[in-house]
Amino acid sequence: MNRTALDQYEELVTDALKSCSAKLRKSFKTAFIQLMILYMVLPRKINFTQMGRYSDSSEQRFRQLFEREFDWIQFNLFLMRQRFGESVRKAIAIDASYISKSGKKTPYIGKFWSGCASQVKRGLEILGIGIIDIDSRDCMMLRAEQTPDKAYLEKQGEDYNLVDWYLDV
């Protein structure tokens, strides 16, 4: 039996969804699998309009899918175990990345450090948390979290700063 790469990918995503502890509806699983395949095959930027255009589902279905709670860490841990096996030598990687963004209504837009530009720039920052398999010298992302702006941190308390937020994540 000759299986394509997309068939193998669909099977892997299905197995990962089965490993999630929460009971998921069949409609959610179907839409989620379709979403993961779209991420692999969309030729341009990925947004809800493009997803609706390149699939047999509507744009609204994908919007609703993103409004639902989902345990990404458990899903990604399953994929990590599939990829790395049960090797013992692992480490946690944390990386904050600057994303250029303009606009006045974007949540948490602020001034963040850009390592490429070696300066503070206005935009967004995303904190990536991954697991490194030391033996295979490979890393897999577990979670990404948008870094809050200065105003949010000030609301949390006088002594609360960005390092405290990183530790809370």
Where do the protein language model's features map onto the residues?
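Conserved, well-structured functional cores that handle cations and Mg-NTP chemistry
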Residues: M1-V169
